[in-house]
Swiss-Prot record:
Protein name: Probable family 20 transposase
GO MF terms held by the record: DNA binding; transposase activity
Iron-sulfur found in the keyword field: no
Function according to Swiss-Prot or TrEMBL: Required for the transposition of an insertion element.
UniProt keyword DNA-binding present: yes
Organism (species): Pseudomonas aeruginosa (strain ATCC 15692 / DSM 22644 / CIP 104116 / JCM 14847 / LMG 12228 / 1C / PRS 101 / PAO1)
UniProt KW keywords: DNA recombination, DNA-binding, Transposable element, Transposition
Pfam family of the protein (one): Transposase_20
InterPro entries: Transp_IS110-like_N, Transpos_IS110, Transposase_20
Family: Belongs to the transposase 20 family.
UniProt-listed GO biological process terms: DNA transposition
PANTHER family per UniProt: PUTATIVE TRANSPOSASE FOR IS117-RELATED (PTHR33055:SF3), TRANSPOSASE FOR INSERTION SEQUENCE ELEMENT IS1111A (PTHR33055)
Length: 338
């Protein structure tokens, strides 16, 4: 078959192929079982294969690259406008193929297996942190029903209250409640141990990667943030500028301009929420500690704080840090504070 471009609709078991030649004539439209996919593409001459950036897309992108094909991943929201008629696999594959023909189409970079492994650690850690927060809130709520209130916020205060209640003699709570609190305490300690173990694994990965080590010199960037940014961004040279990288993270203002009048709103919040959250949390810590410092960055932050709310300043610093991280990753240079 004389194929120049293929749209491949991914699934668990049945894949849909839509292929066109260099004249945009349809020359292939068929279904493939999962076991047939590699053999089908192995028999084809090298061509452009486009897929939606969905579950297992990076795996199949790596597999098809090994077979000599050029692979492009497209975000689903950019494919949807090209779907004709009702949604089914054949229309989806055709839409993917059509979207890949657009000269201005934006593509998702293919991640390596190592990048996905690091991201998996971050995803699991994030889920465990959410579970720990929910459990702490549950413990505080249950104890509050018996008039036992923590005087401070945070995990340490919750655990201290829990241990105080369990150690008090005579027991201030009914016997069934005491047994329940022991189970909740064990569950909370298990979550703490699992989170700590994952953080040690992430830190070990950071220590073994000189590229990530360079990111730690930026104020507001710790091992968790540096590891997550490096794993998600991959080759930062895919972004032409630092502003494009910040926009990819959703840290630039949303724009609604017309007739030459520029109107900027809140940040767009596009892209990876987890990465954006880490950068803003790190920036917030820097903003909180800048009051008594005299370096250029602290003076800049102090000036902003006189005009804008602290959270706005934190987002501005997160934007600046994102641009710095892009420069360090794309140019493979060390951070030199201004």
């Amino acid at each position: 078959m004389n194929l120049s471009r293929i749209g491949l609709d991914l699934a668990k078991q049945v894949f849909q192929v839509h292929g066109v030649d260099r004249h945009e004539h349809v020359v292939c439209r068929r279904q493939l079982k999962r076991a047939q996919v590699r053999d089908f593409f192995r028999q084809l001459p090298p061509c452009l294969v486009a897929m939606e950036a969905c579950g297992s897309a990076h795996y199949w992108a790596r597999e098809l690259r090994e077979l000599g094909h050029t692979v492009r991943l497209i975000a689903p929201q950019f494919v949807k406008p090209y779907v004709k008629g009702d949604k089914h696999d054949a229309h989806d594959a055709e839409a993917i193929c059509e979207a890949a023909s657009r000269p201005s189409m934006r593509y998702v970079p293919v991640k390596s297996a190592e990048q996905q492994a690091v991201q998996s650690m971050h995803r699991v850690r994030s889920r465990l942190v959410r579970a720990r927060t929910a459990l702490c809130n549950e413990v505080r709520g249950l104890l509050g029903e018996f008039g036992l209130i923590a005087t401070r916020r945070g995990r340490a205060a919750t655990m201290a209250l829990l241990e105080t209640v369990m150690a008090t003699e005579p027991a201030p709570l009914p016997a069934p409640m005491g047994e329940l609190l022991r189970e909740l305490k064990d569950e909370l300690q298990t979550l703490e141990a699992r989170i700590a173990r994952l953080e040690r694994q992430i830190q070990a990965h950071v220590r073994g990667d000189a590229r990530i080590q360079r990111l730690l010199a930026v104020e507001g960037i710790g091992p968790i943030s540096a590891s997550a940014v490096a794993a998600s961004a991959g080759d930062a040279r895919q972004f032409r500028t630092g502003r494009q990288f910040a926009a990819w993270l959703g840290l630039v203002p949303r724009q609604h301009s017309t007739g030459g009048q520029q109107r900027l709103g809140n940040i767009s919040k596009r892209g990876d929420t987890y990465l954006r959250t880490l950068l803003i949390h790190g920036a917030r810590a820097v903003v909180r500690c800048c009051a008594n410092k005299t370096d250029a960055r602290s003076r800049w932050l102090q000036g902003l704080l006189q005009r804008r709310p602290a959270n706005v300043v934190a987002v501005a610093l997160a934007n600046k840090n994102a641009r710095i991280l892009w420069a360090l990753l794309s140019r493979e240079t060390c951070y030199r504070p201004g």
